[in-house]
Structure formats: C-alpha cells, structure tokens
A protein has these predicted regions:
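Active-site and donor-binding regions of nucleotide-sugar-utilizing enzymes
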Residues: 38-42, 54-66, 79-227, 369
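Catalytic binding pocket for nucleotide-activated donors in carbohydrate/polymer assembly enzymes
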Residues: 327-336, 340, 367-443
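A nucleotide-sugar donor-handling region in carbohydrate enzymes
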Residues: 23-38, 185-288, 435
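N-terminal subdomain of nucleotide-sugar transferases
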Residues: 2-90
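Donor nucleotide-activated moiety binding/catalytic core segment of transferases
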Residues: 121, 282-285, 289-291, 316-370, ...
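C-terminal amphipathic helix plus adjacent low-complexity
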Residues: 12, 275-280, 411-469
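A conserved nucleotide-sugar
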Residues: 298-314
C-alpha cells in the first residue's frame, strides 16, 4: 500500500512540472460511468449519439445520476481527484477568501495560478475524454470551483443541478442568499433548481440572470409521484405493521450550534432582516429529546413483538462519531435491542420503498416528512413541547404546518400517537390537500416529469453553447 506521505509530494511534483499526461491518467482512473441499470463501471462506453455529462462530486447526487443515465452517458467522479489538483495551490481551503482577495495579494496570485493550471490541464483532459457538459450540485465547494470555471474556458458548459432546495425557514433562505452574494456571479451556463423559492433567492442575490435559472423539480421525486398515482397496488401486500423513524442526531442544526462567544459570520455581512443569534446557542434539551425518542421506540419494540420498528439513518451517520449518541440512547433505555427480532437499523434501505411499506413514519427536519405526507402516511413529529417553546424551534422546517401532522408533546405522547396511528391511519381530505400543496412548494414537479424537463434544458444548453462556438 502506497503511503500518503509519499503520494502527496509526488503529486505536487507532477503539478509543478505540469505533467498533464500523467495527471490525466491518474484522474481518468477515478472516473466511472453510471450505467442505466444503476451500476458503475470503470470502463466507459462510446457516446453513441447520447450527450455526455461529467458529474463532479458524485456522492452528493443521490438518485439523480440514475435518472440522468436513462437519457445521457453519465461519467462521474468524487471530489478526491479535483482536490489533488488544487489543494497544493492554497494555504487554506475556503475558496471565497481567494475569489475576493485584492489584486496583487498573495491569495489572488495563488487563485490565478490555480485557475491557469486547471485550464491547461482540462485542455488535455477534454481532448481525451468526450464530454458535452459538466454538472455540480452546489457552487460552494473548492474542489469544484476551478474545474467548472476552466471547463467554461475550454468550451464545456457547466450546469448546476442545485440540490439544497429545502429553504423552509428564514435562516436557510438567508444563508443561501449570503453565500451567493459572497461568491459573486455564478460560474456556469445554467442553474436548475427544485422550486421557485430557490430561483428567487438567486435572483435577489444577483447570482445569475433570470434566463439562466430554470425550475424543474427534483429528479428523484419522479418515481415517488408515479408510485403515489399507483398506490392501490401497494396496499394489497400483507405484512407486519411497520413504524419507521428517520434518524436525526442531537447536534443537528435545528437545535442550534454553540458558537462559544464568537460572533458568527452570518451576522456580519449582508445583514439579515431578523436576529439570528438564537441559532448560535444550542438548545439545552436536545439530548433529552433524542434519548426520549429512542427510548420510546425501543420500549414499544420490546412490548409489541408483532410490529416492526425501523431506524433509518443515512449510511454516513452510522460511520460518524455522532453515532455514539444512539448507542448511549439505547443503553439508557435498558432494552437490549439486539435480541429483538422486530427492531432493525437500515442505513442502506431505499427511502421511498421504506416509506411505502411503513404504516407510520416519524421524522423531523427532513424532506421525508412531506414525501410521506404526499403518499398519505400518518407522520408523527417528535417536536416535544419543550422544544416548541424554545427559540431554536424557529429553525424547525415544518413549524408553520404542524396542523398537517401528528405532533407529540413528550415521549409518552409519542408512544401513544404511534399506537393510535397504527390503529387509525385516516387522513382528512383538507389535510391531504394541504400536504399536497406543501410538497409541491418544495418539489415543483412538472407534469411531464422532471427527467424530461432536465433532459430538455441540458440538451438546449449544450446545443446553444455549440452554436456560440
């Protein structure tokens, strides 16, 4: 195994010598093709009439690459290789500090050197790899910045498939606005967003012109909407009743973050219209709420062996140091869940399949709340009264829509609501209507399907770029 301390100096040497062919070979080895069956291959097919997308930072797309692979040849790579190429130019890794550095400064010189290097490298890269456009999911990552900027210089358009569409409460809206202002102008040809709220934030920040931003919904929601329209087929399946808790950790931003007396950057620039200082004082009851939620689930699983209880974390959560709080919660519950045949932790389960197969869904600041609501599932929000009475509740996604869900006041009420909703899953018509409106506020799915609209936009951008050349 090659040691990191040997690899880094070698890479720096290759970059300094502009050994582009060797660097190309190293980067090419990290690029995979997403097949239309969802598999990845290090062997790339020929375009065969399909336009080719090169997706940067591929781990952040979730199901989007699978959807795009139906209509495009999709090549993708993680941030690792672009990071190799760029990190040696910088002493710190907040790209905004270099973008906005004054002319003549060391930081500006480093920024220009990195940009010039990447432009020359990509000239070689694109001469050997057929690519029609580059996509990203955000504009804030240093690893992506020079790649997309230099791609445009090499006549390869950059299209951002912006994924942070859950701009539900004021602080998230403000943070997206503030970040866009700090970055200045969008480095690319087009932005596709999930909803009108995102588009308006970018317009207000003068990040991009109206003609450069399209609202097209979310690719991964096409299958959900299709399944909802055929939901009668799923209801016929007989099985044990199932309760699913979509996992959250106690240090999630909805509970606030301790700033330790330092005035947060968010309060210093492009002044917010509201006082956001509450968000930088973490709610003291967050651990108790977290432990109570898991104690309630564990005790119900112990008592009701004919009901399945699922904990659904993201896979990265299980690997995170934050997972120790889950272990502590189970220890505090006094229940040995490893001995329960009806208690499961499912980090790799398909989210939509899990929602459809569940009788009751429990979640917090997650899009699964409105996804489950659209399907017609009872959704329980364990936003206990003490949290609702705190200032940090301002950052709870669904604080203005509690009437569309079941809201638990404490752990005992949480247990009661789960059992009640297992027996009675009725959703009143007016609540169904409100839930549907809420879902389409954040996922503005076109009637023809998001994939058709994305395909049309991407094709138009690529063709218009060719016409300019």
């Amino acid at each position: 195994m090659i040691k990191t301390y040997l690899v880094i100096p070698f890479l720096k040497y290759l970059i300094r010598k502009e050994a582009f062919l060797i660097l190309f070979s190293l980067v090419r080895a990290t690029i995979k093709e997403r097949r239309n069956d969802g598999s990845d291959s290090i062997f790339h097919s020929k375009p065969d009439g399909k336009k080719t997308i090169l997706a940067l930072d591929s781990l952040r797309y979730r199901g989007d690459l699978d959807a795009l692979s139906q209509n495009f040849r999709v090549l993708h790579l993680t941030q690792r290789a672009p990071g190799w190429l760029i990190k040696g130019f910088y002493h710190e890794f907040d790209i905004v500090n270099y973008i906005n550095a004054p002319d003549g400064s060391d930081k500006k010189a480093q920024y220009i050197a990195a940009s010039n290097f990447m432009t020359k490298f990509l000239r070689v890269f694109y001469s050997k790899v057929s690519v029609d456009c580059v996509t990203t999911v955000n504009f804030r990552y240093t690893e992506d910045h020079h790649w997309v900027k230099s791609s445009e210089k090499n006549s390869i358009p950059h299209i951002m498939l912006y994924r942070e569409g859950m701009v539900v409460y004021y602080r998230t809206e403000y943070e997206v606005f503030r970040r866009a202002k700090r970055f200045g102008k969008f480095l690319g040809s087009h932005i596709i967003v999930h909803n009108v709220k995102c588009k308006n934030i970018f317009l207000d920040a003068k990040f991009a012109s109206k003609s450069k931003i399209s609202v097209a919904g979310a690719l991964r929601m096409d299958s959900l909407v299709s399944k909802v329209n055929n939901y009668h087929k799923y209801k016929k399946i007989k099985r044990n009743k199932k309760v699913t808790l979509f996992y959250f950790h106690p240090n999630t931003p909805m509970f606030g973050v301790d700033a330790k007396g330092v005035t947060p950057k968010a309060l210093l620039s492009h002044g917010p219209k509201k006082d956001l200082s509450y968000a930088f004082n973490a709610w003291s009851g967050r651990f108790d709420l977290f432990y109570d939620v898991h104690e309630a689930i564990a005790k119900l699983a112990y008592k009701y062996r004919d009901i399945d209880f699922i904990i659904k974390p993201k896979d990265i959560m299980v690997a995170s140091p934050q997972w120790k709080y889950y272990d502590k919660a189970i220890e505090k519950s006094g229940i040995n869940v490893s001995n329960l045949e009806n208690y499961f932790i499912e980090p790799y389960a398909n989210v939509h399949d899990l929602i459809f197969s569940s009788d009751v869904v429990c979640a917090m600041n997650s899009s699964v709340v409105i996804e489950s609501a659209l399907i017609g599932k009872p959704v329980i929000l364990p936003v206990f009264k003490e949290y609702r009475d705190s200032k940090n509740f301002e950052d709870f996604h669904w604080k203005d829509d509690l009437d569309l869900f079941d809201v638990a006041d404490d752990k005992h009420d949480f247990e009661r609501l789960i059992l009640q909703r297992l027996d009675d899953d009725d959703i009143p018509k007016e609540v169904e209507k409100g839930r549907k409106e809420l879902f389409y506020t954040y996922f503005d799915q076109p009637k023809e399907g998001a994939i058709d609209k994305y395909t049309s936009i991407i094709n138009d951008v690529v063709e218009s770029y060719k016409n300019i050349d």
